């Protein structure tokens, strides 16, 4: 689950990570009164969307007066911001965050993420803050250091020698960065986060370190433990089909193609999308029904797929392991009859009880196109759609 920058800063502030003072606005009303409560001559006006690249897209403005800040708020609210992370459709700006400006001496990058190879949490630190960390890693790898955390001991300390030798930091700077890192670690563990990123972490002219921007993602599987975090969810920032899918235990991601996919298992779903592209078409979605799909689940999956007007055909690709193919076939037939599916439907069943499943499809009286192999299934649906 993602949250907005202002929400991330509120959480970090509770864990004693220094952040600039600010407030969120959903309209221009009352902005002047709230700005006057900030102790600054310069204000940063930031569009709040669940995507990076806001600055380059015009979503971050520096205001040198209260009047200029008000005007920026009026100009930003309601616009559609297009960044390299939003896709061409962009995201509408419904919230603006206004905060005190900071005097910047130096920008750093600091994040805490899960490293799947090490099965540990890893801090990533760089002297090249404010930039795309992937580009820094590619072009200047020596400017990045990583510190993995032993889960048995938890956070103890950053490797001061690495910080000192790689970035020429003095003992006071290292101590302040280490304290912030410890507080980030505490926030990460306490909230069941999956990522905390501060970019940039700035050193001010007075020698303080401040989180100028913040991003926090949470582990969806742990949200049941954190109702207070669930309340931060902004459904306006999410695709409505993905929200509906999550209600039924389905993993759904909307894409730009015209062939809907219903598959069990994330790996098989990705392979299915790949082979659709291989044969010259584009998938309309990623949809994993999981290992225990029922008739009701299959029906909801069809509804979600067909809610996309771009879908011109559907490929169902099921491997019966835990899931029995005859049960899935019955669910497909029942859902197809209930919904009167008009687009071409290709079904490939393999695994447990697949022969019984194929028989159910054949005897259904519905125009369901059967396929034995994945390649065969992909070619058939591509042919039907073109």
UniProtKB/Swiss-Prot annotation:
Cofactor field: Mg(2+)
EC category: ligase
UniProt EC number: 6.2.1.5
Amino-acid positions noted as binding substrate in the UniProt annotation, renumbered to this chain: 264, 321-323
Ranges for domain ATP-grasp: 9-244
GO cellular component, one term: cytosol
Stored InterPro entries: ATP-grasp, ATP-grasp_succ-CoA_synth-type, ATP_grasp_subdomain_1, Succ-CoA_synthase_bsu_CS, SUCC_ACL_C, Succ_CoA_ligase-like_bsu, Succinyl-CoA_synth-like
Residues given in the record as ATP binding sites: 46, 53-55, 99, 102, 107
A molecular function (GO) term: magnesium ion binding
Keyword Protein transport: no
UniProt-annotated binding residues for Mg(2+): 199, 213
Protein task: Succinyl-CoA synthetase functions in the citric acid cycle (TCA), coupling the hydrolysis of succinyl-CoA to the synthesis of either ATP or GTP and thus represents the only step of substrate-level phosphorylation in the TCA. The beta subunit provides nucleotide specificity of the enzyme and binds the substrate succinate, while the binding sites for coenzyme A and phosphate are found in the alpha subunit.
Entry similarity comment: Belongs to the succinate/malate CoA ligase beta subunit family.
Protein name: Succinate--CoA ligase [ADP-forming] subunit beta
Gene that this sequence comes from: sucC
């Amino acid at each position: 689950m993602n949250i907005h920058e202002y929400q991330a800063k509120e959480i970090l502030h509770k864990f004693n990570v220094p952040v600039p003072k600010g407030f969120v606005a959903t309209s221009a009303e009352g902005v002047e009164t709230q700005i006057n409560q900030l102790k600054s001559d310069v204000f940063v006006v930031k569009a709040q969307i669940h995507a990076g690249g806001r600055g380059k897209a015009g979503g971050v403005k520096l205001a040198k007066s209260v009047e200029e800040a008000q005007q920026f708020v009026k100009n930003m609210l309601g616009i559609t911001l297009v960044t390299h992370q939003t896709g061409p459709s962009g995201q509408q700006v419904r919230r603006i965050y206004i905060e005190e400006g900071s005097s910047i001496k130096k920008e750093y990058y600091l994040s805490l993420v899960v490293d799947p190879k090490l099965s540990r949490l890893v801090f990533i630190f760089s002297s090249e803050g404010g930039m795309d960390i992937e580009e820094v890693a590619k072009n200047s790898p020596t400017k990045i250091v990583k510190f993995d955390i032993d889960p048995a001991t938890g956070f103890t300390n950053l490797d001061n020698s690495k910080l000192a030798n790689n970035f020429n930091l003095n003992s006071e700077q290292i101590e302040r960065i280490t304290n912030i890192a410890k507080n980030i670690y505490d926030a990460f563990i306490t909230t069941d986060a999956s990522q905390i990123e501060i970019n940039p972490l700035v050193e001010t002219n007075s020698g303080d370190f401040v989180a100028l921007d913040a991003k926090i993602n949470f582990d969806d599987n742990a949200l049941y433990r954190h109702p207070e975090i669930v309340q931060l969810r902004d459904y306006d920032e999410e695709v409505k089909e993905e929200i509906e899918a999550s209600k039924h235990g389905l993993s759904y991601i909307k894409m730009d193609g015209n062939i809907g996919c219903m598959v069990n298992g994330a790996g098989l779903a990705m392979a299915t999308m790949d082979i659709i592209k291989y044969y010259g078409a584009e998938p309309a979605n990623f949809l994993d029904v999981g290992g225990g799909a029922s008739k009701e689940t299959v029906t909801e999956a069809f509804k979600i797929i067909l809610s996309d007007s771009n879908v011109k055909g559907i490929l169902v690709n099921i491997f019966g392991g835990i899931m029995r193919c005859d049960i899935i076939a019955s669910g497909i037939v029942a859902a197809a009859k209930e919904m009167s599916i008009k687009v071409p439907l290709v079904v490939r069943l393999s695994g447990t009880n697949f022969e019984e499943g194929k028989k159910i499809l054949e005897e259904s009286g519905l125009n369901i196109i059967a396929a034995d192999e994945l390649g065969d299934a992909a070619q058939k649906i591509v042919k039907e759609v073109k």
